[in-house]
A protein has these predicted regions:
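Transmembrane helical core of 7TM receptor-like proteins
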Residues: 1-313
Length: 313
């Protein structure tokens, strides 16, 4: 670790450890990670391709699904260069500007995903509670506005983070015990007070993920009331069945996020590898599982994918 003793280098770079202490088996660890990244890319690209090429899927529900797939793809590609760089080439140094850029995209896309999940819950609410006005409420123009507002809100709230980190002097260490750059990990290396960063980080989470999760819960409360008011048991099951994929996507996103938050807040005594694994679960499991869930649980998507593979054969 020459970087630890090279003062001039420390001023320009961070040092990513990956799975520290397991360097001799990094090539083996890379196999499941490569498989996950490949599956994420193929799965989400397939979803995007199917929705784009099939005119019958040009509906609000599938537009939102395309947004989710695009966000998952971006989140995967944000971490891929440094993760595989460490495993394959032992490339552990990352310039501070590059690190802050990666941090910006990871956190922005995480917030975009939360916002897209909220938009999808609104879609389900309108489809079940106000089906006759579904196409007039969720017009293509309005869907585009919802997508753009998700990106703008997330980007504008995350944009200050690199500047808040840039003002610090990192005199203790430039070693990040991760394979990518995260705000919480970088600010721990600062010599001066991090109270401003800490408060702003909590503010961002509260007004994005916090608000989104409450509104998703509210939408499903109203959906459940509407479903229970339906006359026949078959109608209730049909209505709930259209929500299963989205509920799975919500759980896949929020449960790892809550787990990661609990580990960061109360898991100081836990081995470092637990922190690492939780961060990988949070960033990789939703992009990995969302295409699988929607392919299995959404009949239209499943049928179109099967047709594509039959055509290839």
């Amino acid at each position: 670790m020459i970087i630890l003793y090279n003062t001039s280098l420390q001023k320009a770079t961070f040092f990513l450890t990956g799975f520290q202490g397991l360097e001799e088996i990094h090539s083996w660890i890379s196999i499941p990670f490569c498989s996950i990244y490949l599956t994420v890319i193929l799965g989400n690209v397939t979803i995007l391709h199917v929705i784009r090429t099939d005119a019958t899927l040009h509906e609000p529900m599938y537009y939102f699904l395309a947004m989710l797939a695009l966000t998952d793809l971006g989140l995967c590609l944000s971490t891929l260069p440094t993760v595989l760089g460490i495993f394959w080439f032992d490339a552990r140094e990352i310039g501070i500007p590059a690190c802050f850029t990666q941090l910006f995209f990871i956190h922005t896309l995480s917030l975009v995903e939360s916002s897209v999940l909220l938009s999808m819950s609104i879609d389900r609410y309108v489809a079940i509670c106000n089906p006759l006005r579904y196409s007039t409420i969720l017009t293509p123009r309005r869907i585009v506005k919802m997508g753009l507002s998700s990106v703008l809100r997330s980007a504008l709230l995350i944009l200050p983070l690199p500047f808040l980190l840039k003002r610090f002097q990192y005199c203790r260490s430039h070693v990040l015990a991760h394979a990518y750059c995260l705000h919480l990990e970088i600010m721990k290396l600062a010599c001066s007070s991090i109270i401003v960063n800490h408060i702003y980080g909590l503010f961002v989470v509260a007004c994005t993920v916090g608000v989104d999760s409450l509104l998703i819960f509210l939408s499903y409360t109203l959906i459940l009331q509407a479903v229970l008011g339906k006359a026949s048991h078959q109608e209730r099951l049909r209505a709930l069945n259209t929500c299963i994929s989205h509920i799975c996507a919500v759980l896949l996103f929020y449960i790892p996020m809550i787990g990661l938050s609990l580990v960061h807040r109360f898991g100081e005594h836990l081995p470092r590898i637990v922190h690492l694994l939780m961060s990988y679960v949070y960033l990789l499991v939703p992009p990995l599982m969302n295409p699988i869930v929607y392919s299995i649980k959404t009949k239209q998507i499943r049928q179109r994918i099967i047709k594509k593979f039959e055509f290839v054969k």
